[in-house]
């Protein structure tokens, strides 16, 4: 694969970072995505508040938009279906926090930093004030809750456009960047990679990988709602005509979750720790201190 660097160089660097561990590449980025803010136009208009541009404004909007609607139903300012890294990273990073050091070898001092703890505290406090919900069994599914006016805001990806159009075609919503904090407006990087393992036909496998990341294949995938990672494909009329602009803008600052072998366990431990905080079993500092110690051990394995 003497042309690996040439092929990889034609793909978005941010997306390629998801296929890298310890400075070594293990594949090519295939597509990419990220999450942006979706908000209910009518709910914001009726409340007389502006779309939040900062995390402080976001927290304030969550409180003002929660309560009881005209039908006597409970409504919430924000819906979040989980407490994993995919869900929490935009808040942690935007508020200036982090999960590990740059080398991804240490969590203590990062995962339990004052900035990370502040992000978790904000989340927990909003939950305790009944301003956000979504991850508990029995909660209204995200698309239904948003489309029926029970949730005022979401952080979601491009797939939500088709879901809402199919289920609630008359529902009016708009999108905006992730509210910014001390760290800026930073969302989480998603998408898929394509890799070769123990193929008996390495040349054919590499040819297929190159085809899937070519301009032609990437434009075809864009027609199905996938955001291309091929830089040339991003400049085509087909891709520019798609409703990707808000996501592509957010991708300029989006970050990937730690590319470490222990990420699955790391992520599970993160969700468990934050659950303890939102349930009031531990303070954010206590939970993050304990979590940082656990993750240090995982990273050292």
What are the language-model segments listed below?
Residues 1-35, 91, 170, 174, ...:
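Hinge/lid segment of periplasmic solute-binding proteins
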Residues 1-11, 42-53, 152-153, 163, ...:
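Extracytoplasmic "Venus flytrap"/periplasmic binding protein-like
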Residues 1-11, 68-71, 76-78, 97-118, ...:
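Short, solvent-exposed loop/beta-turn-alpha elements that line the ligand-binding surface or hinge
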Residues 14, 18, 169, 222-272, ...:
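Long, aromatic- and glycine/proline-rich binding clefts that accommodate carbohydrate-like moieties
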Residues 21-30, 35, 59-108, 151:
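Extracytoplasmic/periplasmic solute-binding protein
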Residues 55-59, 134-148:
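Short helix-initiation/N-cap motifs at beta->coil->alpha
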Residues 62, 105-135:
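Glycine-centered hinge/linker elements that transmit conformational signals in sensory
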